[in-house]
Each structure stands twice: as structure tokens, then as C-alpha cells.
């Protein structure tokens, strides 16, 4: 079984934010695989299904981003899974908008949702699918970063992200069916 967690903030006011590309990717992946988020469990909206022979659970934590680890920890215990059984779909400021990167482990890279997961489950050894959202303009002080991640995508940027979300959903399917090495070789750009 694989547990796929999309990171984001709950609520309609956040749905189009850069910080919510994890939720957006999971929504697309769920739709393509006829999975609905029809359950509430472990501080999350969840749905389950199968990809080939692999059972999967999709989860969108309903905590705010900075508390995502609480939901992930509960989900791991509920399904009796290890950190190596999870895939976290997240936004990444350090990647140009639309770029994807799959990797196992590593630091949180300044992402508070990932930091919360690492703290609450006690390890950083889980797979991440990072979707680039780019950095705010030149000066990179705290207020600009917050405004950037909580801002919505505009015009041309929105088109780039829609394409990236579609590719990220493909990457998830490839990751589940063919493994990290194959998916990384195909989708890391």
C-alpha cells in the first residue's frame, strides 16, 4: 500500500494558491483514476483505490500547512505504514515554475509543511514529488515569500502550472507502477 499526501491549506480561499499545488495535483490524479475524496480520517480528506495491483490511499490534510505532520503521523498509524510507504506532493520555491523533481529523503528545504512531517514522523526518508513554483522577485525577504506562496498563479504562469500538474499526476502513476528510479529518470527536469 502507498499513501500519497498532497500538501496544501484547507479552504476555498487557498485553493488556487501556489502553496496548494500538492492538493491540485492530488485532485487531478484522483479524477484520472476515478478516486473520490469521500472519507474524513486522521485530520484529512481521503480516498482510496488501486493502480495496477497497488492499493493506494490519497490524503489531503485538513490541518494548515505548518501542521501537516500531525495528519501524516495519524495516517501512518491508521494504515500501519512506514515512512517509506508515503509520497508527499509539495510546492517548491527553489525550482522554476513548472519544473518537477522526485527524490527520496533530504531536508525540508525551508518548506514548513515538510518540516512538520519530518518532525512528527521522526524521519526524512520518504519520497517527495516537488512541483516548482519559482521564487518571488529579486529580494527574498520573509514577507515576500509568504505573499508569493499564498498568492495565486497568474495568466501565463497558470498555464505552465496546469501542464506541470498534469505531468506530476503522470509521475505519480509512474512512481507507483515502475518505482522511483524510472519515474525520476522520466520526470525530473
UniProtKB/Swiss-Prot annotation:
Segments crossing the lipid bilayer: none
Alphabetical list of Gene3D superfamilies matching this protein: Peptidyl-tRNA hydrolase
EC nos: 3.1.1.29
Subunit structure: Monomer.
Catalytic activity: an N-acyl-L-alpha-aminoacyl-tRNA + H2O = an N-acyl-L-amino acid + a tRNA + H(+)
Subcellular location: Cytoplasm
Annotated site, Stabilizes the basic form of H active site to accept a proton, chain positions: 91
Function: Hydrolyzes ribosome-free peptidyl-tRNAs (with 1 or more amino acids incorporated), which drop off the ribosome during protein synthesis, or as a result of ribosome stalling.
Protein name, UniProt field: Peptidyl-tRNA hydrolase
Residues the UniProt record annotates as site (Discriminates between blocked and unblocked aminoacyl-tRNA): 9
Active site, UniProt feature: 19 (proton acceptor)
Record-level GO cellular component terms: cytoplasm
Amino acids binding tRNA: 14, 64, 66, 112
Listed GO MF terms: peptidyl-tRNA hydrolase activity; tRNA binding
Keywords carried by this UniProt record: Cytoplasm, Hydrolase, RNA-binding, tRNA-binding
InterPro entries the UniProt entry points to: Pept_tRNA_hydro (IPR001328), Pept_tRNA_hydro_sf (IPR036416)
Entry similarity comment: Belongs to the PTH family.
NCBIfam families: pth
Highest taxon in the source lineage: Bacteria
GO biological process: protein quality control for misfolded or incompletely synthesized proteins; rescue of stalled ribosome
